[in-house]
Curated annotation (Swiss-Prot):
Disruption phenotype: Early flowering and increased sensitivity to inhibition of seed germination and plant growth by exogenous ABA. One of its GO terms (cellular component) is cytoplasm. This is Importin beta-like SAD2. Keywords: Acetylation, Cytoplasm, Nucleus, Protein transport, Stress response, Transport. Functions probably in nuclear protein import, either by acting as autonomous nuclear transport receptor or as an adapter-like protein in association with other importin subunits. Involved in the regulation of the abscisic acid (ABA)-mediated pathway in response to cold or salt stress. Involved in UV-B responses by regulating accumulation of UV-absorbing pigments through mediation of MYB4 nuclear transport. Involved in trichome initiation by controlling GL1, GL2, GL3 and TTG1 transcription and may affect an upstream regulator of GL3 and disrupt complex function. Signal peptide: none annotated. It is found in: Cytoplasm; Nucleus. Belongs to the importin beta family. GO terms for biological process: protein import into nucleus; RISC complex assembly.
Length: 1040
């Protein structure tokens, strides 16, 4: 197709007012996607200056989307891998995109830049070795912007890569940094530089940042080279930003080119200090460099940062992000004695005249509060905003100061805060320092953990709250009412000597849900969560629960905030089954809120949009509600129509961001409903499609509802032909298990699903034994991890248990029977250094193997010769002993856990070791080291809880018997099953039984007798358990 015709189709697809025309053009574009030269033609249209800009933009978007989807198909699902771009087209695109990416208008550059990023990330260095030469050539020939633009993408590729993946960085630095240093030096010398110069300097800074983010390239350990860079960064950092040309608009001003250069320079200096400038954190070979940095640069940077911060003290301007970064550096300096000594003479001015004012309510806050309260709430609860916020950095600085240098700083800071509280109390209404009071309250809330642990403050907290915080629940100033709620929430868990104070605070927070100001209502919800968690007498809340939920949903209609949902989850958790009368209404409201959040998120198309986070929160809350009413299956029938549309939409590509949460809901619906409805069965094809196309990372999550479909809807699974679920399952498992590009770790759930089929459909899926067995054995020959080998062997065991004769026959037909059994027995015998089994570690694994091997014992001699019988018999005995020992060990651990739990219940909730120490730094710098040792001890304790020993190289088994799952073999006792199989053999072929008995040495005869005795004990126990259940079922329930 020629360029003109393609341009017409693009125009029609995007701009035609007639829907049918748009649809036809979109279909044409879909058909053209994988034709030769199509990608190249899109690029030609995008860069054609004679073409209409709207069409160029559409072409650039199509170009970007095609490259994102198809350039590197190995990153996608099996279905997408078939749609590869022709190599000749790739070559043409690589050759041309570099030329045009910096020449096109900014509107198009972002699209082409994204495309270039995808290509570089996929192709450099293997498929695009000439790229770095292109960069060097253009740097030398003064095509600086294009070269820096590409080099920035290239360096960004390796920013977060681990050591072994960072090898190309060394070459990039070696071949380009000398030129970059020369260019940077030249740019700094230019008098009255333009914004274009700022853009070039910013790009160089970002390239440097990406190159040093995780590791310092070896070239920079050359002190002459490093010093040359530092001279430039310090020069840029210390010189004032040009006044002329700064925009007046605050949003434009903070993004102005020269402020961006300043931000990146400070960013780099901070990173060098925090990552490479602390000798205690470095390896022996890097310690001299860190000592040099500490001696030559750390103090100078500190002085520069303090001088820079003084700008805001005298009324000057600094962007929020720059203030945040400057304070981060100062916070990192507090624990270093040499740095703290430099900081000390200016500390009071910094703390009381710069940091504290940043914590106070300000003009910008007031403007937002009045003009856009929704935006005020969004900024206050946005994690990304927190990263850039001067207020957050100020709170972090104060926290670090009192944590590391508390003895000299906590008393004076508390005194300062109390003075503000007292002056506020004494002042007339007109003169009250409302904003300073807000900052003081923020400080008290931020220091909550420290004050709760430190004498004499911890004994005075209740009095402080009653005197200085709780009165502001009724303040005429909205932001103080909001702050009162927030601070009250921070201290909700303290021991109130007078429960009336807790009660009053709780009711004040609940009243705050009806406040006229939106931010007060939101902060009240946030605080309520803490009060609900801390509440020992739920009767305080129970009577107002319906009204509380009403206020919740009114607020959810107004604002999208995941903290609202967290509080709701806390209430549901706390009240459990008592939420049953509200469950249906809650799910309806949450579903409605979810759709609203989703629509907002799609409309904003914003990656850090609060709507998207709140949407996830709604789904999580629905899961929490379903869990809380899991003992009431009929409720699931009522709730299903409300949440089914969510699952149907979000189990497609539309729901990739919430796929895990939706699958959790699907798991509850398929497990707890009285039966699985046909509507819920409509989710099966969506899961299958996702699994094949793009969702293999979610296979463990998909496994759960698919297991439920098969185990709880077995009849429908077996009989339905439209769609044919059996065939559908085989198709997807076959596609995944035969794909050589899929790693072992990605298909661990496949053998588990095969197990589900054969355990739940016993005697009804004979036709699937051969296909699944061939699939399993084929993958077994290629499997690399022992965990996947174990899972595949268990598929063989499950099939033997399902039908030993049929399975053994198919195995013989493959010609691999001996190979499979040899591997099985070899894996059974393998031990770890600790002496524990290396494979089949869980009780479930051992039991499956026991049942599979035992099933062979009853086969006639013609199918299973004596020599094989003896080998299997001995292996089964060993396995039964190991299984018995593991069951006994688990029972012992359960008993110990129960005793510890009972002991824990008898001890006070408040019995924690609290000596009031505040972890002070002394004259040495041991504080961080002590903390490090403590963390190492905690890490060691945590590691001790893992099932696998330290000396176990094969750590790919991430399952334990604590993963509670139900299985049809739960009702089968492996010991009884074994003894019954031997009796069948004895009855049907006495001679064969006698030969087997005579082949056993004394040890195995003793084991066999022990297992037989244990089996009889188990029969008695099983019978007793049955009688107990029958008695319990027949006992009438007393009405409450």
């Amino acid at each position: 197709m020629d360029l003109h015709s393609l341009a017409l189709i693009l125009r029609t697809a995007a701009l035609s007012p007639i829907p049918d025309e748009r649809k036809v053009s979109e279909q044409q574009l879909n058909q053209l996607e994988h034709t030769p030269q199509h990608l190249v033609r899109l690029l030609q249209i995008a860069v054609d200056g004679n073409c209409d800009m709207a069409v160029r933009q559409i072409a650039s978007i199509q170009f970007k989307n095609l490259i994102a989807k198809n350039w590197s198909p190995e990153d996608c699902g099996p279905a997408v891998r078939q749609q590869q771009i022709f190599e000749s087209d790739k070559e043409l695109v690589r050759d041309n995109i570099l030329v045009y990416v910096t020449q096109v208008p900014t509107l198009l550059r972002s699209q082409l830049g994204e495309s270039l990023k995808t290509i570089i990330y996929a192709d450099y260095p293997e498929q695009w070795p000439r790229l770095l030469d292109w960069v060097k050539y253009n740097l030398q020939n003064q095509q600086i912007y294009g070269a820096l633009f590409v080099l920035r993408i290239l360096s960004r590729k390796y920013e977060f890569k681990s050591d072994e993946e960072r090898t190309p960085v060394s070459r990039i630095v070696e071949e380009t940094f000398p030129q970059l240093l020369t260019i940077f030096n030249g740019l700094i010398q230019i008098p009255n530089p333009s914004l274009e110069i700022a853009e070039l300097m910013k790009l160089i800074c970002k390239i440097f940042w990406s190159s040093i983010y995780l590791e310092l390239p070896r070239q920079l350990f050359d002190l002459n080279v490093f010093n040359a860079w530092m001279v430039l960064f310090l020069s840029v950092s210390e010189r004032p930003v040009p006044v002329e040309g700064q925009p007046m608009d605050p949003e434009l001003r903070k993004s102005w080119g020269w402020w961006k250069v300043k931000k990146w320079t400070v960013h780099i200096l901070n990173r060098l200090y925090s990552r490479f400038g602390d000798p205690k954190l470095q390896s022996p070979e890097n310690k001299p460099f860190a000592q040099m940095f500490q001696k030559n640069y750390a103090g100078r940077i500190l002085e520069g940062h303090l001088n820079f911060l003084n700008t805001i003290r005298v009324g000057g301007y600094l962007p929020d992000r720059v203030i945040n970064l400057l304070l981060q550096y100062l916070s990192n300096s507090i624990s270093k004695n040499s740095m703290y000594k430099l900081l000390l003479p200016r500390l009071d001015v910094l703390l009381f005249e710069i940091v504290f004012p940043l914590m106070c309510f300000n003009d910008n806050d007031q403007k937002l509060w009045e003009e856009d309260p929704h935006e005020y709430v969004r900024k206050g609860y946005n994690i990304i905003e927190d990263l850039y916020s001067p207020r957050t950095a100020s709170m972090d600085f104060v926290n670090e100061l009192v944590r590391k240098r508390g003895k000299e700083n906590l008393p004076k800071f508390v005194k300062f805060v109390v003075e503000i509280f007292l002056s506020y109390e004494k002042a007339t209404v007109e003169e009250k320092p409302y904003r300073q009071k807000d900052g003081a309250m923020l400080a008290v809330g931020a220091l909550c953990d420290k004050l709760k642990q430190t004498d004499p403050y911890k004994s005075q907290l209740e009095l402080m709250l009653v005197q200085h915080i709780f009165p502001d629940f009724n303040s005429p100033v909205g932001h103080l009412r909001a702050k009162a709620a927030w601070v009250a929430g921070q201290y909700a868990h303290i021991n109130f000597s007078d429960q009336n104070n807790f009660r009053k605070a709780l009711h004040s927070v609940v009243s705050g849900l009806r406040d006229p100001d939106l931010p007060v209502r939101v902060d009240s919800v946030f605080a309520l969560r803490s009060f609900v968690e801390a509440c020992k007498d739920l009767n305080e809340i129970r009577p107002i629960l319906p009204q509380l939920l009403d206020e919740f949903f009114k607020l959810m209609n107004e604002v999208e905030n995941e903290d609202l949902v967290f509080t709701l989850e806390t209430i549901v958790d706390k009240f459990g089954e008592e939420m049953a009368p509200f469950a249906f209404g809650l799910c309806q409201n949450l579903a409605a809120a979810f759709w609203r959040c989703l629509n907002t998120s799609e409309a904003n198309d914003d990656s850090d949009d609060m709507g998207a986070l709140a949407a996830v929160g709604c789904l999580r809350a629905i899961s929490t509600i379903l869990e809380s009413v899991s003992s009431l299956p009929q409720l699931f029938v009522e709730i299903e129509p409300t949440i089914l549309p969510i699952m149907q939409k979000m189990l497609t590509t539309d729901g990739q961001e919430v796929f895990e949460e939706v699958l959790e809901i699907a798991s509850y619906m398929t497990f707890y409903s009285p039966s699985i409805s046909l509507d819920i069965w409509s989710l099966w094809p969506l899961m299958v499609e996702a699994l094949v196309d793009w969702g293999i990372d979610f296979f463990p999550n998909i496994l759960v509802p698919m297991d439920n479909f098969i185990s709880r809807g077995t009849a429908h699974f077996l009989t339905c032909k439209e769609p044919d679920y059996q065939q559908s399952l085989y198709n997807v498992l076959s596609t995944l298990m035969t794909d050589r590009n899929i790693e072992d770790s990605e298909i661990e759930s496949a053998p588990k699903l095969i197990e589900v089929v054969f355990q739940n459909c016993k005697g009804q899926v004979d036709q699937w034994v051969e296909p699944y067995l061939r699939l399993t054995v084929d993958r077994l020959q290629r499997a690399e991890t022992s965990y996947v080998k174990s899972l595949l062997i268990q598929v063989v065991a499950n099939m033997l248990y399902y039908n030993p004769g049929l399975t053994l026959g198919v195995l013989h037909n493959t010609g691999l029977a001996s190979k499979v059994f040899d591997l099985w027995f070899q894996m059974l015998q393998q031990k770890r250094k600790s002496g524990l089994p290396a494979n089949f570690k869980r009780e479930h694994d051992k039991k499956v193997c026991c049942l599979g091997l035992t099933s062979l014992l009853a086969l006639p001699g013609g199918q299973f010769p004596d020599e094989a019988l003896q080998r299997v018999f001995r292996a089964t005995l060993d396995l039964l002993v190991a299984y018995k020992n593991q069951l006994a060990e688990a029972a012992k651990e359960t008993e110990v856990d129960y005793e510890e739990e009972m002991n824990g219940l008898q001890s006070s909730d408040d019995d924690y070791d609290d000596d009031g120490s505040d972890g002070e730094m002394d004259d040495t710098e041991e504080g961080d080291e002590a903390q490090s040792v403590k963390l190492q001890k905690l890490a060691a304790q945590a590691k001790a809880f893992h099932y696998d020993d330290d000396d176990d190289d094969d750590s790919d088994d991430d399952f334990s018997d604590e993963d509670e799952f139900q299985s049809p073999i739960d009702e089968v006792d492996a010991f009884v099953f074994f003894v019954d199989a031997i009796r069948v053999m004895q009855a049907s072929d006495a001679q064969r039984f006698q030969n087997l008995n005579q082949s056993l040495d004394f040890t195995y005869q003793a084991i066999a007798n022990g297992i037989a005795q244990h089996a009889e004990l188990r029969r008695v126990e099983i019978e007793k358990e049955k009688q107990k259940k029958l008695a319990a079922a027949s006992t009438p329930v007393t009405a409450l």
